[in-house]
Amino acid sequence: MTKSLLRTIAAAGALAAASFTGAAQAAEAKLGALSFLPNHTAFGKPFADWVGKINGESKGSIQIEIKAPGSMSPFTMGNAVKSGVIDMVHLPHTFYQNLLPIGDAMKLNQKTPKELRANGFIDFMNKLHNEKVNAEYLGHWGLNIPFHIYLRNKKIETADLKGLKLRITPVYRAFFRALGADLIQIPPADVYTALERGTVDGLGWPQWDIKSFGWDKQIKYRVDPGFYGTSEAFLVNLDKWKTLDSKQQAYLKKSFQDMEDEMWEKAKELNAFYAKRQAEAGIQTITFSPEETARYKKVAYEAGWEEALKLDPVNGPKMKELIGGKY
């Protein structure tokens, strides 16, 4: 074999090795992500833990970087993932209601994650997200974490909220209005001061994590039972999703399903933990008679569905068929 031929073979081998290395590097998918709450909070931690698991398990196939909290308002994250400014977002459905109004109806869900996967709901939601949000819908978690009414110092005997000024979000706007409350919408950062000054008499919030915001120092009562359920969605920009190969896509979907089922069970324990924590902070529970409790829940779901069906009369009935139940 001539020296010239050897040099040619060596050069070809080097080129092939370089090409292989480049292909291997290109195969690793890197995604930038944003969460609606910081990683250390009760609602931010499950997402951060899931990302950590992905980065550790995927062996260089997928790497997700959570961008600094506060770098973008949660209410603009839906538009950001739609346009591709960010690859992945973790946020409640109500925060991108401008893009997908019916998404907020997830609060009314009465099915388990496994039931929703089996009855075609995930496919239904994914199609809507593909069309309206330019996103792949991995799923959601938090559906069995209830919301409650928290009151500063006014104890109520019935589900009559007339004369009470309550801080709201779109999640429970229709419900609180149906019970006669005066509605006030302010950012979470302003809630402590509003409670302290009496600008609001209370607010709606999930059972988790009022302590992180210091609200437990201002709140004396929690109304039981809870109503609705939180719903935190995981979305991936659709154009970015299509750059992933089939194995990467399947891995992300399976990993999220595992997390979804795990958090469904874990939430049951954490609901009890946070209820105990609130009691230790001196927060008392308000309970109604069985008849009043039944009316309270009936109004919650009827008001919620009435609003949802008005927002999207086309997709609303199908949504109700897939996630609805008897309170």
Label every PLM stretch briefly.
Residues F20-A26:
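Sec/Tat signal peptide C-region and signal peptidase I cleavage site
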Residues A11-G13, A26-K111, E115, F121, ...:
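N-terminal secretory/targeting leader peptides
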Residues A10-L15, F20:
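Hydrophobic helical h-region of N-terminal Sec-dependent signal peptides
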Residues M1-A10:
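Bacterial N-terminal signal peptides that target proteins for export
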